Amino acid sequence: MEKKKTSSGCLPGKPCFPWVGGKRRLLPVLIQSLPENITEMKTYVEPFVGGGALFFWLRQTYPHIRCVINDSNESLVNVYRVIRDTPEELVGLLAGIQGEYHTLEERTERRDYFMEKRRVFNEEHPDDITRAALFIFFMRTCYNGIYSVNRKGRLSVTFGTGSRARILEEELIRCNHKLLQDVIILDGDYRQTEKYAGEKSFFYFDPPYKPVNEAGTCTSYMPDDFDDDCQIELAGFCKDLGGKGSK
């Protein structure tokens, strides 16, 4: 069955990789919670973009709204920038990685390939396009799609089931390339998005989760945990945005 395309002539945009905590399945609920006057809004800001499920939906549905996305995970943000600026180079690298990976018959061979790519990512300081390709590869082949780094900030994702996962979605990358044009892409502290606050702007926050126990796997999203004090500071930040008229 042919997949339905949007008015822009491409497949509906969505994240190019699995992302723990992503909101694709919750989109109907989030959409119902958008401001009633959304058509009058001029700026949408997502300070913790992650996989960007709501961002991609909104970008296609309300293309007149300026979008600002940010994340403290520079490696993640780099993927968005590469898709926006050099999609064909990214497609070429992913095709090569997928071809190499799928020729490996044994799980141990695929694990060794995964670990070597992780070493390259951590130790050889590859260029931005290569880093983006490796990031997508890791997220499609690592254990449960869980991104993790150690306390030194080195990537520590673990190998998954070893199946021949689909690594390259060429048409999706090209669609997202179109959607990311003119999007302001930031990396760093969420507070830097405050300058986009105003009566015609609205913010969507999906910060890192507090783990349900001390062994929670998602605490390793970044080297520094987003603890209770950070959550309290974020609540104050949201209050300040409301004082400036933002939704």
Indicate where each model-derived feature is located.
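Conserved nucleotide-cofactor-binding alpha/beta core module
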Residues: D225-F226
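Conserved S-adenosyl-L-methionine
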Residues: E40-Y101
